[in-house]
């Protein structure tokens, strides 16, 4: 399993790479994201938190053994961790810099996994799971670096993106 797309409030990024090898690039509208552009994206709170969620909200171990990358853990978690690695670098080192305080394991009632981490001097809850598990609890969004109330059209836009990706036989997760 490999992450192929990352859709944020700013648009959809395609992701290159194979399997659990944490090598690959993001592209936006067909143009590869350069290191300079990635630095700019990392200054955007929404993108940065999405990338942090990929790097922190999992229990997988990604490692290179005998020149081959492999993952120990849930394949979905592992695919997310690999995307986190492509954006933030080694997820093990990233997690060491942002200590985990608590975990709420995935369960079929909540339909999501959540973790609390120290991140950028504050405690943040990072969650990932099926989009339906987020709808009842989604009240806020990040717009231009500010946390603002979510609007009905935002939910509709996310629902359309979800259906579009699902129609391409993609497993869709919400962050």
Regions found by a protein language model. Name each.
Residues 1-175:
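Conserved cytosolic headpiece of P-type ATPases
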